[in-house]
Amino acid sequence: MTRARDLSLAAAIVVWATILGGIVYSHMVWFPPYLAGLPKTATLAATIHDESFWLTAHPLAILSLLLTLALNWKLRARRNLILITIAIYAVAIITTALYFVPELQAFRASQSSNVSPAEWYVRGQNWQHLSWVRGAFMYIAFIPLLLAWRREVH
């Protein structure tokens, strides 16, 4: 059982690290030029299909975290750390569904709106700043997983 616990936690850490890599890449390479020139740059959204990455990474993260939680449930120290990560992740997913994704959809459709480029710029910059905050929370949520790895289970 110890091996399964450790392997599941290692898998969750790898998946989480992959998500963090996607966050950094998106925020350093993709979003700055895309959000700086809306609505003119809205056509860039058709050139990148990052949804396949995110629609794979997030279910893998959810499954790996739940499996890790189940396998480590009897180990209180690990369980609590894994639950911290899950709680932060749940808040991030909810805010993503309620704010970030709808705004991205609005950005994609910005060429057909009556909103001025100046207003799109402000919305894009606000979105990006808030998304950096969301990303920081995702990094913070990684720390408990790493600490759980360090917990003695033998």
Give residue spans per PLM region.
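Short, charged juxtamembrane terminal tails flanking transmembrane helices
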Residues: 2-3, 150-154
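Interfacial loop at the N-terminal end of multi-pass membrane proteins
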Residues: 4-65, 104-125
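Structural signal for membrane-spanning alpha-helices in multi-pass inner-membrane proteins
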Residues: 23, 65-72, 96, 142-149
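Membrane-interfacial segments
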Residues: 38, 76, 111, 153-154
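Core segments of transmembrane alpha-helices
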Residues: 57-68, 135-142
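Histidine-centered, metal-coordinating catalytic motifs and their short helical/loop contexts
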Residues: 124-133
